[in-house]
Amino acid sequence: PATEIIPTPRSVKAGQGTFDLGGGIRIAPADPLLRPAADYLAQLLREEDVAAAQDAGNANLSLELDPRLPQQGYTLKITPARIELRGGSCEGVVSAAASLRQLLWSGKGSLPALEIDDAPRFAWRGFMLDVARHFFTKEEVMSLTDRLACYKFNRLHLHLTDDQGWRIEIKRYPLLTRRGAWRTPNKHDSVCLRRAADERDPKFLLPEKNIRREQGKIRYGGYYTQDDIREIVAYAAQRGIEVIPEIDLPGHSLAAIGCYPQLACDGRVGWGKHFSTPLCIGRDSTIAFCKNVLTELFDLFPSQYVHIGGDEVERTPWETCPDCQRRIRAEKLEGAGELQAWFTRKTEQFLAAHGKTLLGWDEITEDGLTPQSAVMWWRSWMPSTLTAALQNGHRVIESPSEFLYLNGELDRNTLGKVYGWEPLPESLRAWEEGLLGIQANMWTEDVPTADAAGERLFPRLLAVAETAWSAPEKRDFADFRRRLPLHLHQLERAGWNYRLDDVEGVCDDNVFIGAATVRLLPPESAELYYTLDGTVPDTASQRYTAPFSITDSCTLTLRCYNRRGVAAEIRRASFRPTRYAEPSADAGNLQNGLLVRWYDYDGDNCADIDEAPLQANFITDSVVIPDGVTGNIGLICDGY
């Protein structure tokens, strides 16, 4: 039977009858390990106005661990009398709860009897949020985590540090957040603020909650205390999601260097030929700083993985730094490139000694790491780095910028492009076991608010969820679009913005004779406003309620607003009146049909046909190859 579950399950079998929700749900976890999952499920049920409590003595919903199932797999069985959730692990049971939750969205007081047998295609189904370029509060991260749980994501990667901000409390280095978490508005902020003004769109304003004023100056930023991190990690864990921290090393480190200048080779914050000033990894004190920061992470993040970045490092300062040159000689390295490789290997060893696994962007494939480290492939224009990582025995997470960087602007084609991407083409099948999974990323240089993030993320993130979970033969874009409206409604209900479908009924450029009738079809649940003078519409502009006529040249500017009053993207269409063209000469006596000229042309470029020898002329009543035309054929048809 057809369901509206995203990602689509492996198998759904219809049963007889329905389970009535009116009598409430009494939950019994069969294993103490499942009590957090039972608490979570009870919370989900209450959010859907279903009475729920744990009651082992009179239960009508059971949670069980079943070692016969795949570790992350689950079964969900609904009969008129009871509901059973089984998982190969606690994570599997939480995935079963996610499917049950989606059935509740369309249940309307009852649930259909059915049986779902399901398991993921990939073990790693991740999402990365950049909180360094623009900061997102603990509450916003937790709200997003809840959306991830709905769609069976199981990794949340937090990009906690970068040139533009340090977002996690490190008790040994208090300046990292006291100073490094705050900045004078920078070029990224200026781009956002200019867009907010030009487009009359508050979702590009810097949130007031992330601004403080010091001596009359505005400072933007924010950070997570260690207690905040513990709360986020626990919240995610209850939802089957592991939180991966990223501390970007040894590049992308200006926020740290600005607080502790001795971390840089020359003590200055700045930029090189391509990237920002890196850490001075020739000094033992810098290595100690890195180890001390990572050590504090170990107590906060239970995850096996620690992401160290490793990308886009400006190595030129190391070439003239006495400390770095001394390190290069002492370690018998060949230049600055090998110095970074040495640093990455040392960090790998340090993490391994603490039971952690190094994870980094695909640049680390050049650093001679052991196969125990994992690689996140992002440079879609360099597929060789993906195959190199797999050939070297690394576990790999695919995160290609072309398909899974969701911070880019959207259009009508981007959802299909994301959905249609295949992570495991035939060329990679030999290394299938090395592919841990896939991850979507949200970089936030021009994304200052949750509403701006939501418009970029949704519904594309749901497409990523289906690619990560469902087998290729189960994925169908038309069916995905069929299931989508329910989920968009739930996003809106949860306070999350999403990209509205395009307004139908108008082209970008329009030419008309006399008058043009404009018939627009806005997305469901949206209000459409427009102007005819090129200005940006808002809710004070003309609202579209019925077709209208245009008689003069103008620019029609359209913008939709969702139920929460959040503005969608702006679309412009030009209208220009014209008249029928006058004949360039007396047509003389005309015959019905098309004039077809046959040229002796054997090329493949239409523009060159009439340069070949003319063979004959014909009159035809349609676009056909006339009788008698053989050999090299180049035809040009004229008429109207």
For the regions a language model picked out, list residue spans one by one.
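Contiguous, structured surface segment used for ligand recognition
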Residues: 1-124, 452, 456, 468-490, ...
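Feature activates predominantly on carbohydrate-active enzymes
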Residues: 69-287, 293-305, 346, 350, ...
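Active-site beta-loop-alpha junctions enriched in small/polar residues
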Residues: 132, 161-165, 248-252, 311-313, ...
